[in-house]
Each structure stands twice: as structure tokens, then as C-alpha cells.
Swiss-Prot record:
A zinc finger (CR-type) spans 133-211. Zn(2+) 2 binds at residues 163, 166, 185, 188. This is Chaperone protein DnaJ. The lineage of its organism: Bacteria, Pseudomonadati, Pseudomonadota, Gammaproteobacteria, Alteromonadales. Belongs to the DnaJ family. Its main location: cytoplasm. CXXCXGXG motif repeats lie at residues 146-153, 163-170, 185-192, 199-206. InterPro entries: DnaJ, DnaJ_C, DnaJ_domain, DnaJ_domain_CS, HSP40/DnaJ_pept-bd, HSP_DnaJ_Cys-rich_dom, HSP_DnaJ_Cys-rich_dom_sf, J_dom_sf. It comes from the Bacteria. Residues 5-70 form the J domain. One of its GO terms (molecular function) is unfolded protein binding.
Length: 377
């Protein structure tokens, strides 16, 4: 069975750079990796095919032999059959930085339509922006369709000519005894067309790099890790193929007051010693402004008060989270002599009273006494 063209397997052009080869390989290796396609023999075969194509095109000597003689040229270097070595060792350095899905679009010889690559943009948001939603202007470098040559790659007023060797197929047939093997056409390098007078703007590629400005609408309630897909906003396709997609990845920055946990918000609210002991009504911050919170008498530090529907509205439903206010009783500092005397008097009154004024402290002392009694027995 004849092997497929390596450039076709990776979905790249024959003048692809080393970076483009690796990018295509990482995307397809992730798509067909056995860990994700367990039990699917057809996808495992594709995975092996992708790996073999990359091993050839990533090696300058093998690539040169392949470009001139096809798979036979590589085999003559002593490569032999496909190396089915351990997958984990082969790809351990790759899966950590992969994003986006597998590449779609054409394969085969000639100038067939090929979908453009997907792009990713990391967007930083404040908590307020994430909770309320916002439209933001972004700028992304991308490959765009060349309007000068209308994507043909040929200079305006000229056109690419059909290759006279492969007659536009991008492949030629080479016979070896009883067998016929298809390989990339050496004249047009598998393109099926020859551009004798390339476009000055895109240099014959039909696309060129340009920064694109666009507005992205962020819905209310997004959180770190959420991703928005903008269809058709990725790199322009080749040979009339559709554009890829743009994925906007959210990263919500830390807030100086609130800490987010899903749709709930948490904050710490300082209260005075007297407010905790006697009770009070205080103001606490929310994303919609200040609201009043009633602190009952004898409130201990660390107590959490739940304020219903003062959190974040879910981006996936109509439910709204809560605001969890944790009160922290502050110890008074920089006391005057009179204040010190009053506190000492207060402590004396508490100590002489039979009423338990410090439930946690007295419970702790009881536990300590029991502990030492057990040790001595």
C-alpha cells in the first residue's frame, strides 16, 4: 500500500518553515494520540502516519531525500519500517504547550483548499469586568488573505500555470517493477501550479502576516479558564480554504477585597472589640456598592455571614452566588493610660465573676487540664 505524502499528512505546504512543521505535528499528534483515542485502530494508524511524516520533515537530510525521491529516497538511507517506540517518550515535551483542536481541511496533491490555523489570545480581566461583562479591543498578529493577488500568489495581471509534469495533480507516479508509487511532483513541489511571477505583497504565498484589531464581547460571569471561540477569526485559509478560529482564554486578576470561589465571593471584614461584644450594624462592600450587615452581640472572630445573591451571576445559568463575609475582631492598639486602666478593670471584673465570659478560652483550658491529667495517670 502506497504511503501518503508527508506534507499532505501534516496538512502543510511544501515551503513550510520548521516552526510550521512542528506546529502542525503537535496539533495532529494531540488529536490522534492513543491516550485520547484508545481502542480506535483507524486513529492509531493516523497517529503513526503523523509521527513518521514529522520524523522525515524534521530531519534536514531525510527531508532533502524525500523532496527529491519520495519515500523511496528515505528508505534508501536505511530507515526501513516505521519505528513504533514508546509514545510517552516521543511526546513528553510536546503536550504541555498545545492549545486548540486538530487542523481541519484538505490534503492530497495539488492546490486543494486548506483551513487556516486556529489562534489563541490570553485576555486579562479585573474581577469587576469578569462579573459584569465587557467589550474589549484586542490586536492579534495573524495570516490574512492577500487582497493584491486575491490569494492566488501570482502577480496581479498574471496567473499561476498548471504544472506540465504532474498536470495539476501535485503528484507523479513512479514505477518499481510491478508496483506504482505516487510521490510529490519535483517540479511544482506538490502544489500542482507554478508561479513564475509571484505577488510582491505575499511573495507567492497568497497570504501575509498582519496585525488585526477586533472587538471581543465578554459575557458577564466568566472566570479564569473559560474560553470563547470566535469562528472564522483565525488565520486565513490557503487555496480558497476557510479561516481558522480564534480562542480567547480568560484570566481574572486577583482582587484587593474579594476572593472568588466559583459564583461565590469571600471577603474579610474587620470589626472592633466592642462591636463584636455588644453587637452592631456595619457596612460591608459588595460589587454593587455598600450594604448593611447586622452583627449580633457576642460574635466571635472568624464567624462567617452569608449575604444571599450578592455574589456572581453564573455565565451558564440565571443563578447568582452569595457573598461570604468573615468577621475579624481587631485587637485595639496604641492605647492611652486611661484605656489601659479601663481594660484592666474590665478583665478584673470578668475574672471575679462566676459567669463564663470566655467560652473558647475556658474550653481550651479544660482540655489542657484533661490532657495533663491523662499523662500523669
Amino acid at each position: 500500500m502506497a504511503k501518503r505524502d508527508c506534507y499532505e499528512v501534516l496538512g502543510i505546504s511544501r515551503d513550510a518553515t520548521e516552526k510550521e512543521v512542528k506546529k502542525a505535528y503537535k496539533r495532529l499528534a494531540m488529536k490522534y494520540h492513543p491516550d485520547r483515542t484508545s481502542g480506535n485502530d483507524e486513529l492509531e494508524v493516523k497517529f503513526k502516519e503523523v509521527k513518521e511524516a514529522y520524523e522525515i520533515l524534521n530531519d534536514s537530510q531525510k527531508k532533502a531525500a524525500y523532496d527529491q525521491y519520495g519515500h523511496d529516497g528515505v528508505n534508501q538511507q536505511g530507515r526501513g519500517g516505521f519505528d513504533n517506540s514508546d509514545f510517552g517518550d516521543q511526546f513528553g515535551d510536546i503536550f504541555g504547550d498545545i492549545f486548540g483542536g486538530g487542523r481541519r481541511g484538505g490534503g492530497g496533491g495539488g492546490q486543494r483548499p486548506q483551513q487556516g490555523s486556529d489562534l489563541r489570545y490570553n485576555m486579562e480581566l479585573t474581577l469587576e469586568e469578569a462579573v459584569r461583562g465587557i467589550s474589549k479591543e484586542i490586536q492579534i498578529p495573524t495570516q490574512v488573505h492577500c487582497e493584491q493577488c486575491n490569494g492566488s500568489g501570482a502577480k496581479k495581471g498574471t496567473e499561476a500555470k498548471t504544472c506540465g509534469t504532474c498536470y495539476g495533480q501535485g503528484q507523479v507516479q513512479m514505477r518499481q517493477g510491478f508496483f506504482a508509487v505516487n510521490q510529490a511532483c519535483p517540479t511544482c513541489r506538490g502544489q500542482g501550479k507554478i508561479i513564475s511571477d509571484p505577488c510582491h505583497k505575499c511573495h507567492g504565498h497568497g497570504r501575509y502576516e498582519r496585525s488585526k484589531n477586533m472587538s471581543v464581547k465578554i459575557p458577564a460571569g466568566v472566570d479564569t479558564g473559560d474560553r470563547i471561540r470566535l469562528s472564522g477569526e483565525g488565520e486565513a485559509g490557503e487555496h480558497g480554504g476557510p479561516a481558522g478560529d480564534l480562542y480567547v482564554q480568560m484570566n481574572v486578576l486577583p482582587h484587593h477585597v474579594f476572593e472568588r470561589d466559583g459564583n461565590n465571593l469571600h471577603c474579610e471584614v474587620p470589626i472592633s472589640f466592642t462591636e463584636a461584644a455588644l453587637g452592631s450594624e456595619i457596612e460591608v462592600p459588595t460589587l454593587d456598592g455598600r450594604v448593611k450587615l447586622k452583627i449580633p452581640a457576642e460574635t466571635q472572630t472568624g464567624r462567617v455571614f452569608r449575604m444571599r445573591n450578592k455574589g456572581v451571576k453564573s455565565v451558564r445559568s440565571h443563578a447568582t452566588g452569595d457573598l461570604m463575609c468573615k468577621v475579624m475582631v481587631e485587637t485595639p492598639v496604641k492605647l492611652s493610660s486611661k484605656q489601659r486602666d479601663l481594660l484592666k478593670e474590665f478583665e478584673t471584673l470578668c475574672s471575679s465573676s462566676s459567669t463564663k465570659h470566655k467560652p473558647k478560652s475556658e474550653g481550651f483550658l479544660t482540655s489542657i487540664k484533661t490532657f495533663f491529667d491523662d499523662l500523669s495517670s
